[in-house]
């Protein structure tokens, strides 16, 4: 199975690729301004991951057009900037976040929907962002599936299409259940075997996470 990872010029992208590889899939990584919609169609991946990155969704190259063009063709997962690009593609406002957190953790409250299935409620997530999707501007077809205690949107999904976004970084060692989140998404891409690999990987990362908090 091959996943297309759209690289928004971010240093974290290969951590995501590593997690996906550990779950058993191959990744093709393309910069957001070095691939067009026609080429994405020719690649015909099992799913598309829109990576974190600097700047705004409007400056994230192919991301917003890709969501509009192919949102009904393959599962799409947006992470951080990729998450914001999904919101913006559906007309939502992305504005300065009420709290600016870079490398800090927050508790995410959720109901276990979509990629968050099986994660603790709440769970600890690592945040690197100064912008956030404004919930009140989201259209009816996009539902919020995770929030911080203060109400900042941390996860959302389309109600009928396989499109999801998370504002936090699942690939961070300080985030709980990152492998499980990605495995849930890979299952929607047609690779449920990832769910068999996830528990051992989650356990390994959790040991590192607890050690980091204890230090």
Describe every region a protein language model picked out.
Residues 2-6, 10-78, 90, 190:
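Flexible gly/pro-rich beta->alpha loop and the following alpha-helix that scaffold active-site loops
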Residues 5, 126-127, 167:
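Short beta-strand segments
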Residues 27-29, 94, 144:
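Generic structural signal for residues in well-ordered beta-strands
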Residues 45-118, 122, 182-183:
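Cysteine-nucleophile active-site neighborhood
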Residues 80, 129, 169:
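Histidine-centered divalent metal-coordination motifs
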Residues 112-161:
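Catalytic beta-strand/loop cores that center a nucleophilic Ser/Cys/Thr
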Residues 160, 165-176:
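Phosphate-binding/catalytic loops
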Residues 173-215:
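Acyltransferase
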């Amino acid at each position: 199975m091959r996943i297309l990872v759209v690289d928004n010029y971010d240093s974290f992208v290969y951590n995501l690729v590593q997690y996906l590889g550990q779950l058993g899939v191959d990744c093709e990584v393309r910069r957001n301004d070095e691939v067009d919609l026609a080429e994405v169609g020719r690649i015909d991946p099992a799913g598309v991951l829109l990576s974190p990155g600097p700047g705004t969704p409007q400056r994230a190259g192919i991301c917003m057009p890709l969501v509009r063009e192919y949102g009904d063709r393959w599962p799409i997962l947006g992470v951080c900037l990729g998450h914001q690009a999904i919101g913006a593609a559906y007309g939502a406002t992305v504005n300065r976040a009420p709290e600016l957190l870079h490398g800090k953790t927050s508790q995410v409250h959720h109901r276990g929907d979509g990629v968050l299935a099986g994660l603790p409620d709440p769970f600890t997530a690592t945040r690197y962002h100064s912008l956030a999707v404004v919930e009140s501007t989201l259209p009816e077809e996009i539902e919020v599936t995770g929030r911080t205690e203060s109400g900042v949107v941390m996860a959302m999904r389309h109600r009928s299409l396989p499109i999801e976004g998370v504002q936090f970084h699942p690939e961070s060692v300080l985030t709980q259940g990152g492998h499980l989140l990605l495995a849930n998404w890979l299952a929607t891409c047609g690779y449920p075997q990832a769910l068999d690999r996830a528990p051992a990987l989650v356990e390994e990362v959790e040991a590192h996470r607890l050690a980091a908090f204890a230090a």
